Amino acid sequence: MKSEHLLGTSIPRFTYDTPTVPGNDFYALCEGEHPLCMIFLPGFDHPVSREYITRYLKTLPQLKGARLVCVVRSSAQAVAKATHGSDSPFPVICDGPGVLYGYLGVEQTRGLLSWSFAAQKIYKAARDAGYHYDTKAPQLLPLTLVVGHLGKILFTHSGRSQTDLPEDCAAISEIVRAVEKATAPTDGPADPHCSDETLTLPDLVGWDN
């Protein structure tokens, strides 16, 4: 299932945990001068997640006119343990149960079907470093969203491979600038019913938007 049907809809208000702060308001995160670029990754310990989060950290000075949020399929406790409780310069939303992934229809595929050449290089480096993985296991594909006020989805891209996502913060800035330019004349308010109630991530299960 592709993600184009999400364009123009609104993500309901919910609270989320980061590795260091629980119970954050998603709509408060959406407020700001520039839209959010939300990038959905596999678990925090997955080689692809580690590779791209590292790239974003290294290229953060190139993030101009945009804001970045990474979503990982890991619990806040697991990420806090892996990072020794250190803060990230951009929010990392921890969705261990995968509620957001299910709500937004984040796709997965089996094994080698999702392995781009870049992914093969990432896996080889991880294997050489001692990481073991099941080549036949289903793999989450990345989802990139640009989100405005009240959770309105302004842009969506479902990755066709595990590395089909913005390669660095410069690419993120370019995407957000293009989206702002394209949506500025017609960007209307988000569906007001979505801001009436603050949900927790589990509350999104079965939500009918």
Model regions: which residues?
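N-terminal "domain-start" segment that seeds a small globular fold
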Residues: 1-31
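Conserved beta-strand and immediately adjacent loop positions that scaffold enzyme active sites
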Residues: 13, 36, 143
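Residue-level preference for short coil/turn positions at secondary-structure junctions
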Residues: 7, 31-34, 64, 140
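Structural microenvironment flanking redox-active thiols in thiol-disulfide oxidoreductases
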Residues: 51-103
